[in-house]
A protein has these predicted regions:
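Conserved Rossmann-fold cofactor-binding substructure of NAD(P)-dependent oxidoreductases
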Residues: 48-71, 83-86
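Conserved beta-loop-beta element that borders a ligand/cofactor-binding pocket
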Residues: 102, 140-163
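Substrate-positioning beta->alpha
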Residues: 167-172, 185-217, 228, 299
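Mid/C-terminal beta-alpha module of Rossmann-like enzyme folds, strongest
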Residues: 206-275, 303-305, 312-328
């Protein structure tokens, strides 16, 4: 199969390129050329420079690809504007299959959710497409109008794994590896779910060659781990590498909120109880039926920790609000 990847040098898109190559597919990657990371520039990859949000640029860049070796499928990993969806719908209309990486943020009532399955309502066209969730919902509709049942919209959940430069999972690893004591929310038994970037990328490549259509919640199964399980995996990964690991200091959510601790940003992945009770409840029965794998969180965390050792990722100082001395 000849796969056209929109993106190719980023977190998910780089992994999609790697997965496609390792399955023996030919890859053309479209980027603006801002990230000189391996992937799209590997010799087996045809690298095309264009801003995918610009229909004229995308059409012009795509013309020689179409003339030489028409792609069998698109995997769209950089849909960040509705104009970008329109540009792809126009420039790539003749490609037989389109897999769009959307987000569970497309759901109108998430958070707090729950999202039992893909029939839950998404944002309507009245919602501002300047915002991420409405933009994803609107982009899905634009692409569905163009590609119909040739479109699969993979509504990704939280993507984690090696190469993740968002300061979420890596922030926990960094804190645990560099402090003596680390404040954590005392919500250890709350179920949480993530999707490993390698599981998602490999599956997107399979999806590009399948005849699946419509939306699918592309994340880990409800209850795949808990908040405490994720933190324990971080601690275990640090300890297994021979580094000292911090003592975890659980603080009840009410005390955290009283102290002005910002959910999610100060303590990554932490949501207040009323939101957490439903926000992590995203039904993934269809993804499981379609074979989206879900490796153990311990494997994801261990590999992320190994990657972090050489990633040169700068971590901001831990906010004073979550200094353990404030909760003594
Ligand atoms: N990270 C998550 O937890 C999460 C959760 C749900 C959904 N998603 C979705 O997953 C997808 C991938 O996310 P990611 O963070 O892993 O992104 P990514 O793969 O790092 O995407 C960035 C890639 O796309 C290229 N790119 C970005 N804008 C472009 C443009 N206008 N024209 C051409 N190329 C462009 C970048 O190269 P250049 O900069 O060189 O152009 C880079 O290769 C996104 O659609 C995101 O909305 C992510």
């Amino acid at each position: 199969m000849h796969l056209l990847v929109l993106g190719g040098t980023g977190f998910l898109s780089g992994e999609v390129v790697r997965a496609a190559l390792s399955s023996g597919h030919r890859v053309t990657a479209v980027t603006r050329g801002r990230r000189p990371e391996p992937g799209a520039d590997a010799p087996a990859v045809r690298s095309v420079r264009a801003d995918r949000d610009d229909v004229a640029a995308l059409t012009e860049a795509f013309a020689p690809v179409l003339a030489d070796d028409a792609p069998d499928a698109v995997v769209d990993c950089c849909g960040y504007t509705v104009d970008g969806a329109r540009a792809a719908a126009d420039a790539l209309a003749g490609v037989p299959r389109y897999v769009y990486v959307s987000s569970i943020s497309a759901y109108r009532d998430w958070p707090p959710g729950p999202v039992p399955d893909e029939s839950a309502p998404t944002f309507g066209s009245e919602a501002s497409p300047e915002e991420y969730g409405p933009m994803k919902a609107q982009s899905e509709r634009v692409l569905e109008d163009a590609f119909g049942n040739r479109l699969l919209s993979a509504r990704a959940g939280l993507i984690v794994g090696p190469g993740d430069r968002t300061l979420r999972l890596t922030s926990w690893l960094h804190r645990i590896a560099t402090a003596d004591r680390v404040v954590v929310p005392a919500t250890g038994d709350v179920p949480v779910a993530f999707v490993d970037v390698r599981d998602l990328a490999g599956w997107l490549v399979v999806a590009a060659g399948a005849d699946w259509s419509g939306p699918v919640n592309a994340t880990g199964p409800v209850g795949m781990t808990t908040y405490g399980g994720m933190l324990a995996a971080c601690r275990d990964a640090v300890v297994a590498s021979g580094a000292p690991a911090a003592e975890l200091v659980p603080v009840p959510p009410a005390r955290l909120l009283e102290a002005g601790v910002e959910p999610w940003t100060d303590l990554p992945f932490w949501l207040p109880d009323d939101v957490a009770a439903t926000a992590w409840q995203v039904g993934t029965a269809r993804a499981r039926e379609l074979g989206l794998p879900s490796r153990p969180i311990e494997d994801t965390v261990r590999d992320t920790w190994r990657w972090l050792a050489t990633a040169g990722l700068e971590q901001p100082p831990v906010p004073d609000r979550v200094d353990p001395r404030a909760f003594a």
